Amino acid sequence: MTRRNVAELANPKVQEVVVNMDKLEEELAPHAKGVDIALAAFGVGKGSAKMADEEVRKIEITYPTAFASAAKVGGARVLAMMTAAGADSRSWTNYLRNIGDKEKKSEELEFDFLGLYRPAVILGNSNTPSAVGFVMPLFHWAMPSRYHSIHKNDLARAMVAQSEQAFLALAQGKGPAAPAVKILEYKEMEPFFVAGDSDAP
């Protein structure tokens, strides 16, 4: 699901669904029927500091919640939601408070398994200068692991692999009896990284 055509998704194994974001839940519903796992990576990206808080909340909370709601109605048991390091609905900073609210909204939907993925600086995308990708790892030793930079492909690998593991456990009757929420920061995502292959799709 995307708001515009993405050339990188041109693959016979991928079905791209372009939707009107303001009618997201309605337009996504037919495509969500029968899904097992939903992965959401909504984010404001570059320029968020210049945006009104109302617009930021629409992108960070309203749209992801609508997406997740459609997936839940369609039958999804597992939701992987990208949030951010430091997310806290009680934070004094608008951004982290908004991301914390996103997490709360996701929890309220009560998926059988909810994975909240909290990356810090995401490398390999147009919003992060390439120089940052070189400099950030040099300082990893001096900062808590939760704030380590992560390549977008490693983040995607972690979201997919952990979600598949969670769904398999549920399908085999080994999952939790009640809805489970797991927060995954850098250390929890690291086992799914591919060393020396961060630029591979």
Regions flagged by a language model, labelled:
Residues 1, 17, 39, 80, ...:
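Hydrophobic/aromatic beta-strand patches that form the interior of the parallel beta-sheet core
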Residues 2-3, 27:
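Short secondary-structure capping/turn segments at boundaries of alpha-helices and beta-strands
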Residues 4-5, 11-12, 35, 88-200:
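Oxidoreductase cofactor-interface core, primarily capturing Rossmann-like NAD(P)-dependent enzymes
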Residues 44, 50-103, 108-109, 114-117:
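Conserved Rossmann-fold NAD(P)-dependent oxidoreductase catalytic core, especially the SDR/UDP-sugar
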